[in-house]
A protein has these predicted regions:
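Conserved acid/base catalytic micro-environments in cytosolic active-site loops
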Residues: 2-7, 13-20, 24, 28, ...
Length: 243
């Protein structure tokens, strides 16, 4: 199996340099190019045919979300969003997931070391390279029979429903939860997503689902009509069953 070809798209020369240098240390990853904006990225995608793209959201000339829409329509490639840990960044990241992004990582900063960042990003790149975007879209679009099965389960069980979702799973998770009836059993969810982004994700789901969705805290009760989403980077919260 060949190396995973990665294109870095970011208007920050510092971020491009850090990502290129750090990711080049991994023998299974090859940085085939960098681009300061979507226009340069467009040409490099055609010429270099990367397996994975890392994409900054806030860029001049064309923002990352607009570019991602065009990319997913004409040349779908597994894309990792590089976002700031701000409310605006979180909101735009969730919109990017709706469009088709498969992963997110926070921009390098004081929250973690460059070494931590590079290890996390390398893992996300490996996971993203295995995502079949065409298959993923078919599952979301044609998943009605499976959703009906889940609804039947919700109406017949008095147990807790546990859901685990990894890279590329946000849209499938949304498709499942929006079909859950208000009287469904309590649900616990682990979604592969960094800290600081799960709060916004839970709030977004809560606004579109019949059930209540919130980011879990220790000692929360798992009750009927409630879904608890594990905080990012933490899958070990403690909850009590309270039907």
């Amino acid at each position: 199996m060949g190396k995973i070809k990665v294109l870095i798209v970011d208007d920050s020369a510092i971020v491009r340099k850090i990502f290129s240098e750090e990711l080049s240390k991994y023998p299974d990853i090859e940085i085939v190019g960098v681009a300061p904006d979507p226009y340069v990225a467009r040409d490099k995608i055609v010429a270099l045919k990367p397996d994975v793209i890392t994409l900054d959201i806030e860029m001049p000339r064309m923002d990352g979300l607009t570019f991602l829409r065009k990319l997913m329509k004409h040349y779908p490639i597994p894309t990792i969003i590089v976002s700031s840990l701000t409310p605006k960044g979180g909101k735009m990241t969730l919109e990017a997931f709706d469009i088709g992004a498969v992963e997110v990582i926070a921009k390098p900063g004081s929250a973690y070391t460059v070494g931590d960042m590079s290890a996390q990003l390398a893992e996300k790149i490996r996971a993203a390279s295995r995502v079949n975007l065409n298959k993923q879209n078919r599952i979301v679009e044609t998943g009605a029979p499976r959703i009906e099965s889940i609804r039947a389960l919700a109406e017949t069980t008095n147990k807790v429903i546990a859901i685990g979702a990894s890279t590329g799973g946000t849209e499938a998770l949304k498709a499942v939860l929006t079909k859950m009836p208000p009287n469904s059993p309590g649900i616990v969810i682990v979604q592969h997503m960094p800290a600081n982004f799960t709060t916004a994700f839970a709030e977004r789901l809560n606004g579109i689902c019949q059930i209540s969705v919130k980011e879990a805290q220790d000692n929360d009760s798992v009750t009927t009509g409630m879904a608890l989403l594990a905080p990012g980077n933490d899958i070990s919260f403690t909850a009590s069953v309270g039907f």
